[in-house]
């Protein structure tokens, strides 16, 4: 038992150190008033500039082609490849990976520490992150491989990091091609001067796979902990009992061949639509307060009050961090689902996953934000995390909302 406790303590220390490195304040910007501070984390430095670069490089493609996103999402599979999935199924799987504690407790934390103005910066991070999602998912499609175990395709950042070479001269219209597995055939068919240099990035692929394993294992534990805590607070069910049920249900899904897609294909749309419908009901029920909530979101994002009070940095950084954590644009999880899709062109899956970022942050995160902001202060005073969101739901819809 002592050895087990020491191992757990060591794991906690490692995770805490990594969290501080990635999400902690790498450096702090202070303005002339001495009170307004921006704590800039490493991931914000990497993901936000990358998102802006991709947005400009693609000429604001996710915004220009938004109607096309919806159209290609509804397309059927381009072939009957056994084990492959459609673009819509890939979107559902990616949405299942995105939607979680970032959309619930993460939104609550952003508003608790950054105020209503943090919601605006979450929206902005989604608009920027959609371009990153487009690029990473398109690359996953280009470098996907046949899955010998389950059929269909598999891929993701670890695959294209391992196989991708630095391309120094390719025509713009040839950046996204259906198949670049055979470089010689591609060059010969297009009569294109094609230069590559360097070697495969095998080390980066392995590093990503290892870090992804640690990350997603930790995220699963966070979600499970929040679920067990919620059931304990709402119904008094012991956390161990809920944990056992979750483990059994997860095993039944994961260990059965191709069961994950089938289950998510049914559960995710129902849960997302139900959550959206509940939020719409709450908004209509409190429609007279909606202008006040919207005014608070924009005024606290840009107004003089947070600037003078020194809270602007907290508003911006909490909104941006929680937005990035929620939509996972740039984290590399969604491309794994994108690679499994069977589409006629890689860009189509890039567009579909960009739409997934919009759904995650602009729709589902906004639902959580409005549920919380439309609840009076006395109903949620002194609460944090899921307890706060449950209290807000209890105020709006009684015990049914808590469920």
Specify the residue positions occupied by each region the protein language model found.
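Membrane-interface loop-to-helix entry segments
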Residues: 46, 54-70, 204, 208, ...
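N-terminal alpha-helical transmembrane segments of multi-pass membrane transport
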Residues: 1-101, 111-118, 129
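Transmembrane alpha-helical segments and their short flanking loops
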Residues: 2-24, 116, 144-149, 163, ...
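Select transmembrane alpha-helical segments in multipass membrane proteins
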Residues: 44-50, 85-94, 197-214, 243-244, ...
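Alpha-helical membrane segments and immediately flanking helix-loop junctions
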Residues: 80-113, 139-142, 149-164, 203, ...
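Helix-loop-helix module between adjacent transmembrane segments
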Residues: 53-55, 96, 125-153, 158, ...
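Extracellular/periplasmic helix-exit of transmembrane alpha-helices
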Residues: 136-145, 280-296, 304, 310, ...
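Selective recognition of specific alpha-helical transmembrane segments in multi-pass small-molecule
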Residues: 128-136, 239-257, 268-288, 321-324, ...
